Amino acid sequence: MRQADVTRNTSETKIQISINLDGTGKAELASGVPFLDHMLDQIARHGMIDLKVVAQGDTHIDDHHTVEDVGITLGQAFAKAVGDKAGITRYGHSYVPLDETLSRVVVDFSGRPGLEFNVPFTRARVGDFDVDLSIEFFRGFVNHAGVTLHIDNLRGINAHHQIETVFKAFGRALRMALTVDPRAAGVVPSTKGSL
């Protein structure tokens, strides 16, 4: 089973994450940041990943440390659960619309962290959530999962829709990239022989 449990404790946050990459999309989320929980639910449901997140952070200051550290810990959990990447498809992509909004996410489980984030947010906040924290989440994820991630919001007016389509497309791109190809069982998807 491709599963992992990761705990991260700092002076700012305490994060516990459990994932099952071969799940059914179940999510138990208690990050302390309600909008982040809503977005993590999109990853679980659209990625068909079982995800449990429990976090305590210094949200009395702001949500930055919690959102970033959840991204870091989730990235660590993915790296652990994927292992040597043998048999996975490696690449994944998805376009997701929501009313007037369209976003595209492309992921490569290359072992090389990289983030291209092109989301021209139409406002600074969605409720209490600072939209700039979404890039901090994804930066934390890519640096610790060892993936290359391209995120583009192609059009959109509603900032909530912009963020939500990004997270839904991310979940679907993960699902594609992590699918095990039976024709490549046990084979690392690289001409180098390792990732």
Swiss-Prot record:
Keywords annotated in UniProt: Amino-acid biosynthesis, Cytoplasm, Histidine biosynthesis, Lyase
Keyword Cytoplasm set for record: yes
Gene: hisB
Subcellular location field: Cytoplasm
Record-stated family: Belongs to the imidazoleglycerol-phosphate dehydratase family.
Protein name: Imidazoleglycerol-phosphate dehydratase
InterPro entries in the cross-refs: IGPD_sf, ImidazoleglycerolP_deHydtase, ImidazoleglycerP_deHydtase_CS, Ribosomal_Su5_D2-typ_SF
Classification via Pfam families: IGPD (PF00475)
Entry's Gene Ontology cellular component terms: cytoplasm
Main EC class the enzyme belongs to: lyase
Upper taxonomic lineage: Bacteria, Pseudomonadati, Pseudomonadota, Betaproteobacteria, Burkholderiales
Top-level taxon of origin: Bacteria
Coiled coil residues, start to end: none
Annotated source species: Polynucleobacter asymbioticus (strain DSM 18221 / CIP 109841 / QLW-P1DMWA-1)
